[in-house]
């Protein structure tokens, strides 16, 4: 059978979109799905963090293997693992465990949820590999615009996923998880049949050394250069801040304002619409006009403003302020994410983009791990608003890290 050929850019975009849909269908419903097991923000943070730290541990291997064997085989491996992890998660939340387990084994379902997140995290290089494919087919001049497609997939996922998840949850709260499993299976079929290879054999690296597969040692190599250290550290701290409060955002809306799954989903749809507009249409012209560095600063300012609005919201003014804060947060994130990623990518060597962007994915995962756990713990101990105040402090540090003309103009060779 002759396979249909599609443009590489479109193939990477569809893969990213399908991956995001599988996650965003479930995301606004997560606290509701976990009610039968736990209501602790700390546990929710650890569940989010477990996925991230597993992704961090696997990121150097995924990046190095994609530079050695090509993008497509690694993408197939990653999506296959996601299928297993999501299906295990769906099975765990669907069973009525009280009918199967004695009291002494009551921790088994929660343990299976953590195992599912570990499996999904270890194989969670879909976004990183797709980002590498986009880097393969783009030039340094249009890389920020190309990376903006990640934001479009992110935005469309947040527009379509939460709405679909909420509609399905009216029949059963676990049905969206099974649909997410279906999206993962479709993604696997799509990657196998339609996604082209973008790394020619004559440009592939040798097998990596054992130390190259250690995520900590890879980060230490990059951090030897002071300018590279500051750029990568800023990337890490930003995602620690951002993913910290997003890990508890649905719980915050549910417990503080009594938001239903429909309202929680609506908040994510707002995020998706704005992210798609900013990263899909505005980011290219804005980068040409202002540059990645200025856009990063502006985006951080928007994120901080959104956090302030969320902390000021109360029962009487909850809906207007909450949605205003969420919208401004989305605007800021839409500016920062592609601008900061392009800023780093453009100043690192174009050789071994898989390893470079794999390390960035690792930093993002490590930041998510620490941010989610810290946010969940502070939510339980210091109150629901504390994660947002922590985000503001971390973002001030990011602004310090990326300040300075030498940092934004000098090229760094990894």
Explain the meaning of each model-derived region.
Residues 80-106, 302-316:
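C-terminal ends and interior cores of transmembrane alpha-helices
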Residues 114-155:
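Cytoplasmic helix-loop-helix junction between adjacent transmembrane helices
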Residues 169-182, 377-395:
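A membrane-interface helix-boundary motif in multi-pass transporters
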Residues 59-70, 278-292, 379-380:
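Helix-to-loop junctions at the C-terminal end of transmembrane segments
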Residues 293-340:
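C-terminal transmembrane helical hairpin of 12-TM major facilitator-type secondary transporters
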Residues 1-4, 196-233:
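Juxtamembrane intracellular "pre-TM" segments in multi-pass secondary transporters
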Residues 28-42, 247-264:
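Short amphipathic helix-loop junctions that connect adjacent transmembrane helices
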């Amino acid at each position: 059978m002759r396979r249909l050929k599609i443009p590489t850019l479109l193939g990477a975009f569809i893969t990213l979109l399908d991956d995001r849909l599988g996650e965003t269908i479930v995301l606004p419903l997560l606290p509701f799905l976990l009610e039968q097991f736990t209501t602790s923000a700390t546990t929710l943070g650890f569940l989010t963090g477990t996925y991230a730290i597993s992704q961090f541990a696997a990121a150097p291997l995924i990046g190095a293997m994609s530079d050695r064997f090509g993008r497509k085989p690694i993408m197939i491996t990653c999506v296959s693992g996601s299928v297993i992890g999501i299906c295990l998660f769906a099975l765990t939340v669907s069973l009525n465990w009280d009918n199967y387990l004695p009291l002494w084994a009551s921790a088994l379902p929660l343990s299976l949820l953590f195992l599912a997140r570990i499996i999904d995290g270890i194989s969670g290089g879909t976004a990183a590999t797709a980002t590498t494919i986009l880097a393969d087919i783009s030039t340094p001049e249009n890389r920020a615009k190309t990376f903006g497609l990640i934001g479009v997939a992110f935005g469309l996922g947040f527009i379509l996923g939460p709405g679909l998840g909420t509609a399905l949850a009216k029949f059963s709260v676990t049905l969206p998880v099974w649909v997410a499993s279906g999206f993962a299976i479709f993604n696997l079929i799509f990657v196998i049949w339609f996604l082209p290879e973008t790394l020619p054999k004559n440009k592939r690296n040798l097998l990596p050394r054992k130390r190259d597969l250690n995520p900590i040692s890879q980060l230490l190599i990059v951090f030897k250069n002071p300018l590279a250290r500051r750029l990568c550290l800023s990337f890490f701290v930003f995602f620690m801040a951002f993913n910290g409060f997003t890990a508890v955002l649905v719980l915050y809306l549910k417990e503080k304002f009594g938001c239903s799954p429909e309202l929680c989903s609506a908040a994510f749809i707002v995020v998706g619409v704005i992210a798609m507009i900013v990263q899909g249409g505005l980011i290219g012209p804005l980068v040409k006009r202002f540059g990645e560095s200025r856009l990063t600063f502006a985006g951080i300012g928007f994120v901080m403003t959104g956090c302030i609005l969320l902390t000021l919201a109360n029962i009487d003014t909850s809906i207007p302020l909450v949605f205003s804060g969420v919208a401004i947060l989305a605007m800021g994130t839409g500016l920062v994410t592609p601008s900061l990623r392009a800023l780093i990518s453009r100043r690192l060597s174009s050789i071994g983009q898989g390893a470079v962007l794999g390390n960035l994915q690792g930093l993002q995962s490590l930041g998510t791990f620490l941010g989610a756990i810290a946010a969940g713990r502070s939510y339980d101990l210091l109150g629901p608003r504390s994660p947002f105040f922590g985000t503001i402090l971390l973002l001030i540090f990011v602004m310090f890290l990326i300040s300075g003309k030498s940092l934004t103009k000098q090229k760094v060779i990894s």
